[in-house]
From Swiss-Prot:
It comes from Christiangramia forsetii (strain DSM 17595 / CGMCC 1.15422 / KT0803) (Gramella forsetii). Keywords: Cytoplasm, Decarboxylase, Lyase, Porphyrin biosynthesis. Homodimer. This is Uroporphyrinogen decarboxylase. It is found in: Cytoplasm. GO terms for biological process: protoporphyrinogen IX biosynthetic process. Catalyzes the decarboxylation of four acetate groups of uroporphyrinogen-III to yield coproporphyrinogen-III. Belongs to the uroporphyrinogen decarboxylase family. Pathway: Porphyrin-containing compound metabolism; protoporphyrin-IX biosynthesis; coproporphyrinogen-III from 5-aminolevulinate: step 4/4.
Length: 341
């Protein structure tokens, strides 16, 4: 039995004394101990070494005290497993030297044996579960097929992912073939994560908000829906789409246990659009963690009041920024823990 099961209760829609809290990218660069490991090991070495991934995953639990751990990894380990070369370049971010920018290249993309290619992730989950000793739940995650396609086609990060969009609109058959391959791999990957011991999973659709609503349904949501459908009876699924407030009504009917919202969508609008029955997660602006700790506390209180303490998970609206002071991150977590109605 997990000692602190606030997150799992919130995902089931049960009443809680206060909302659970965790932060996207909480095992990250704002932690000085993380930076020490970053100096010694490159990014994918940290992802692929179960001992390091475990150490990094547990770091924020010990240092800032959130109610859940999220496995240290990256959404781009999935395309790596699919025989697509992915590097992490300092100062650039993800770099794919051979983008999947033609129908012929899509044919060469494989649907792998996830145990063979991603066994190190499942090993890290088992090790992390042991290290956590049932203190808090462990969340596993994957990128949405659309978000992964964005990197695979664009070849790197982008504000517009114009090449990815062009590819989908000019080669829709090839685009859907690639999206289905990513979806099939992601389902197998997440099912193995569940077997290894994760207590919940989150789908990150970081770039869904770049699509207009009709294209979002076609190129993103229908693949996320497949993943939710395949997983929902085994584990609670959190569906997060940055800038995807326009799809909250459809997302709420998907079988997901919770929906993540960003800071551009007010709590009352998110509740209204999602029908008021589903658990919501979010939506503190990550840049607001630059504010003074006392201001963070007031803003967190306002956020919880706006969402209501039940069917709610306090989180940021996207990942924590790299140079946020640790004390401010802790002030965010503490403010949720100290919340009283």
């Amino acid at each position: 039995m997990i000692k602190n099961d606030l997150l799992l209760k919130a995902l089931k829609g049960e009443s809680v004394e206060r909302p659970p809290v965790w932060m996207m990218r909480q095992a990250g660069r704002y932690l000085p101990d993380f930076m020490k490991l970053k100096e010694k090991y490159d990014f994918f070495t940290r992802c692929r070494t179960p001992e390091l991934a475990t150490e990094i995953t547990v770091m924020p639990i010990r240092q800032i005290g959130p109610d859940a751990a999220i496995l240290f990894s990256d959404i781009l380990v999935v395309p790596q497993a699919m025989n697509i070369e992915v590097e992490m370049k300092p100062g650039v971010g993800p770099w794919l030297p051979n983008p999947i920018d033609s129908p012929k290249k899509v044919e060469q993309v494989i649907v792998p044996d996830v145990n063979e290619e991603l066994g190190y992730v499942f090993e890290a989950i088992k090790m992390t579960k042991q290290e956590l000793n049932d203190e808090v739940p462990l969340i596993g995650f994957a990128g949405s097929p659309w978000t992964i396609l964005c990197y695979c086609v664009q070849g790197q990060g982008s504000k517009t992912f114009d090449k990815a969009k062009r590819f989908c609109f000019m080669n829709p058959i090839a685009a859907h073939t690639l999206l289905q391959k990513i979806t099939d791999t992601t389902i197998a990957y997440l099912k193995e994560k569940v077997k290894a011991g994760v207590d919940a999973v989150q789908l990150f659709d970081s770039w869904g908000g770049l699509l207009e609503p009709k294209d979002y349904q076609e190129f993103s949501w229908k693949y996320m829906q497949q993943i939710i459908e395949a997983l929902k009876d085994e584990v609670p699924v959190i569906a997060y789409g940055k800038g995807c407030w326009f799809a909250l009504d459809k997302m709420a009917k998907s079988g997901a246990a919770a929906l993540g919202v960003d800071w551009t969508c007010e709590a009352r609008n998110a509740r209204y659009l999602s029908g008021g029955e589903i658990t919501l997660q979010g939506n503190f602006d990550p840049a607001r963690l630059y504010s003074k700790p006392i201001e963070i506390k007031y803003m967190v209180n306002d956020m919880i009041k706006a969402f209501g303490k039940d069917r709610y998970i306090a989180n940021l609206g996207h990942g924590i920024l790299p140079n946020i002071p640790v004390d401010n991150a802790k002030a965010f977590v503490d403010a949720v823990k100290e919340y009283k109605e």
